[in-house]
Every structure is written in C-alpha cells, then in structure tokens.
UniProtKB/Swiss-Prot annotation:
Signal sequence extent: none
Function: ATP-dependent carboxylate-amine ligase which exhibits weak glutamate--cysteine ligase activity.
Record EC number: 6.3.2.2
Keywords: ATP-binding, Ligase, Nucleotide-binding
Single GO MF annotation: glutamate-cysteine ligase activity
InterPro entries noted in UniProt: GCL_type2/YbdK_subfam, GCS2, Gln_synth/guanido_kin_cat_dom, YbdK
Organism superkingdom: Bacteria
Protein name: Putative glutamate--cysteine ligase 2-2
Pfam families named in the record: GCS2 (PF04107)
Organism per entry: Legionella pneumophila (strain Lens)
Length: 383
C-alpha cells in the first residue's frame, strides 16, 4: 500500500491546545455557555484559535506553530486576554485544572456541531463524562518515520508528563486520592491507550488504511491514543497532560517535552521493542495515582525507580538540548517544582484544606488562571 502523506515540519516545532473550564461567577459551577461565548468572539482577533469542545462548559485555545516556548507563551497571554475581556461582557470566568471538583457530568450539554452530535450518538454517556480538561502538545517531525519513532520513544516518559501536569485530585464532589483523576477517564473509549507496535510510517499507513476500510475510523481524530501522529500537521500529539492552573505551567511542560523530543530524535537512545508497552499501563497508573511520588518500572533496570528521580536525571541528561532551544528558564523552574514534589494537584489539595470549600477552591483556581495575565478584572468572593 502507498504511504499516507506526512506534512514535513521543522524538527521539534511546537504547538499546544488548552481546554479550560467555563465557570458561573455566582455559583462557581461549570456553566454551559460556550455557544454564547463563541458568538461573542465572532469578530475578535484570534477567533479561529478559540474553539468549542464536545460539551458546552468547555472552551479550547490553540496556539499557532512556534520554535520558541517564549513566543508561544506570549501568544497564549494574548489569547487569554481576549477570553478575559469577552468573559467580562457575559459574566462568566475561566479556570485551569484537569477536572471541576463538584460538577455532575449528567448535567452537561453537547455542543451542537455536526461532529460533536455524531460523537455523542456514537459514545453516548462517555461523551458527557469526558467533561475534563487537558493540554495537548504538538511536536514537529521532519518525516513520518520520525513521528513513529517519537510516538513510541515518548511512551517511556508518559509518567513524567502525567506527574508534572497532574491537577485533578477532585472529581464529582469527592477526593479521588489520585493526583490525576482525569487521566483515567478516557480508558473506556475504543482506540484509547497506546498506538499498536508499528515500527515505521509504512506499517502505520497500512494499519490506518485497514482501519478505514473496515469502517472503524473515519480520520485520525478517531484514535484516542495517549500519543498519536498527526500527519496533516506534521506532528505527534501528546494528550496525557491535565490542563495546568496557569499558562506559565503549560509552558514549563511544553519546554520540557520539546527538549526531550529533540534529544530523542537526535540521539535515538530508546530502543523500540514490545517491552516498552509491557510496563506502560502500570507506570501510567503510578503517575496518575501518586504523581511525582510514584514509581516507574524501566525495562533495563531490576527494580522500580521514583518518577521524581527519573525526571531530574532526564533533565540533566538533556541539558545540551535545553540550552540549544533556549528553554533554560522554564526547565530550571520545572526542576525546582519536581525536586520539591510540587505539582498543581498538591497545590489544589493545599488550597482545599484551607477552607474545606469547593466553591472557594474554584474561585482560587480562577484567580490563579489570571495570575500571569495582564488583565485581572474578574474576581469573585464566594460566601
């Protein structure tokens, strides 16, 4: 079979998608107002980079393509500014975090687009239950073979990405005792989890065409894998991260993945084999449940190692590429967070313990979301 086309990209160019919670300013609950928000944004600059998601209490911002994490950060701040200005006119707010702490998914409304209606008819309750919020990170690859190698090689580091981004300890009004409860939600979807062990772009092309011919998929979006190729963009897409509480944290995560990807593509240090996936689900669980304090099983070692230690060692190992990309400032901040066992899940638990109020927690998350913005017009003081 002929190869699927793959758009050539600059090596480790970056892009990101961030899903945010739409919050009612009075009740601090999720509110289904993305239709109204999209209408209000109709004539705004960057309109095409702000999109609805499958349920109406979600909104997504998309960056453009960048080589520099700093340039991406500047653009995200501009997108945030537009959201904040628009929110003020219709009395809503936004926050980060992988889950809303007390929402009930049964109350969510599907966004009335043709694609989302079709998905709801296919997956029914799973679609509403997927009202959780993530950051997706795109990494540019020169060729399809590079994309397949990177998809597999990054699987070794998925526990890192879950642990550093974890921001969803509360769900449906309970403490889940997971650092990232969001990362467990998509397991029920078909074609979730990991890509099959396909060794090159030819094998992936053959697999894709079979799945299409069998009418299991219609396009690449039907794969819900943790990491998936995006040939129309010339990228691979990492989909395991919770939405951070701040835009800056989203940049720390992106900067780390960018430098790691450059190291992997330049040096090819990960030997691809089925062994990568023998331990994958267990390592993923460790990161979802315990975050930075979880353990990681590496196939060439005899005993588990702490996820935190593995991240710190990896940062030292890829220092050359961090310097080359100019990501030092962001990685130094991330290193400090990791060595101090700090992620957003830890912070959310700490904020909740101060008052024991989910409403006050959401208000604090809304304030944190604005902390690196130029516009802090919105504030609420829940009773």
């Amino acid at each position: 079979m002929r190869l699927l086309s793959f758009k050539k990209s600059k090596i480790v160019s970056i892009g990101t998608e961030l899903e945010f919670q739409i919050i009612d300013c009075s009740s601090l609950s999720l509110v289904s107002r993305s239709k109204e928000l999209m209408r209000a944004l109709k004539d705004m600059r960057y309109r095409d980079q702000i999109k609805p998601e499958i349920t109406q209490s979600m909104i997504e911002i998309n960056s453009s393509i960048h080589q520099s994490a700093k340039e991406m950060y500047d653009e995200l701040l501009e997108l945030q500014k537009i959201l904040v200005e628009t929110a003020a006119s219709i009395d809503i707010a936004f926050c980060g975090g992988g889950t809303h702490p007390f929402q009930q998914w049964t109350m969510q409304k599907i966004f009335p687009s043709k694609r989302f209606k079709k998905k709801f008819n296919q997956y029914r309750y799973l679609s509403k239950r997927a009202t959780v919020f993530g950051q997706h990170i795109h990494i540019g690859c020169p060729t399809g073979d590079d994309a397949i190698y990177l998809t597999h090689a990054l699987a070794r580091y998925v526990p890192h990405f879950i642990a550093i981004s974890a921001s969803s300890p509360f769900y449906l009004g309970i403490n889940t005792n997971y650092c990232s409860s969001r990362s467990t939600i998509f397991n029920a979807f078909p074609l979730s989890g990991v890509i099959p062990y396909l060794r090159n772009w030819q094998e992936f092309s053959d697999y894709y065409r079979k799945m299409y011919r069998w009418k299991i998929i219609e396009n690449m979006k039907d794969f819900y894998w943790d990491i998936r190729p995006k040939p129309e963009l010339g990228t691979i897409e990492i989909r395991v991260c919770d939405t951070p509480l701040t835009l800056r944290k989203s940049i720390l995560i992106t900067a780390y993945i960018q430098a790691l990807a450059l190291y992997l593509l330049e040096e090819k240090p990960v030997e691809l084999s089925h062994d990568l996936y023998y331990v994958y689900n267990y390592n993923r669980f460790q990161a979802s449940r315990h975050g930075l304090e979880g353990e990681l099983t590496v196939t060439d070692k005899d005993r588990p190692i702490p996820i935190m230690d593995d991240i710190l060692e990896t940062i030292k190992k890829i220092e050359q590429y961090i310097n080359e990309l100019g990501n030092n400032e962001y990685i130094e901040e991330l290193y400090s967070d990791v060595i101090n066992k700090q992620n957003d899940s830890v912070l959310i638990n700490k904020m909740y313990k101060q008052d024991g109020s989910f409403s006050k927690l959401v208000a604090a998350q809304c304030e944190l979301w604005l902390s690196d913005s130029k516009d802090r017009k919105w504030m609420t003081q829940p009773s």
